[in-house]
């Protein structure tokens, strides 16, 4: 009877998934799933970064990082097995449009809550709070030791990362060079087109670790504060609440801390634990 009961629940779950595809709401779910045949069942598409070591990184055909761990936990809590999770690379410039056109069901990509306009997407979380940091070539670490040394220099930022205006406020006569991705900023830094990269400290640590050889170094005191959220399509407030509940469970059962420890082992980064884990507030705030 136990096996039959479990089978019945699984069949019911597939019916719910199918009803979602057909646009019905009998199962009271907000998530959009696609069916790739009965063998695989419903899948969930999650937009992630592929170029942020320690957070979202694609290497050898496998995704890894803290954001990936968070995405997997949330998807599992929503009822999706590992084989039903499909990761798709998104860029800051495509995150919102990928949600709007249904390419992905959610985005877990170092997505700061202040990166979007009101009503553009639904947000859940936050799940991590970070500071900003400066990343320089090691041979410049003696002359660029912090934000006070940025005057007259060129600082690279990636779209969707540290806002350009906040970098301009750090020092007089600083030139901000905005690139599409962090690897582009890293290349600019290595060939001398930029003197520093301004990025979230988690991202800066990942870039330095991945480059290896001591070529890059995080310098100075961290500054500013940003909180990472999970984004879903505008209007999916029920799904945002479900994700909030999953994130809270991750923090409560120790899985969040395990993911943090794994990130430390990978890139040597530990977030400011006076700010983490952050309070889950975003889906509730969107109702106000």
Go through the PLM ranges and name each one.
Residues 22-26:
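C-terminal motif of bacterial Sec signal peptides marking the signal peptidase cleavage site
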Residues 94, 110-119, 166-169, 190-191, ...:
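A ligand-binding cleft/hinge motif common to bilobed small-molecule-binding domains
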Residues 85-97, 142, 177-187, 191, ...:
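Short helix-initiation/N-cap motifs at beta->coil->alpha
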Residues 33-107:
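Extracytoplasmic small-molecule ligand-binding "clamshell" domains
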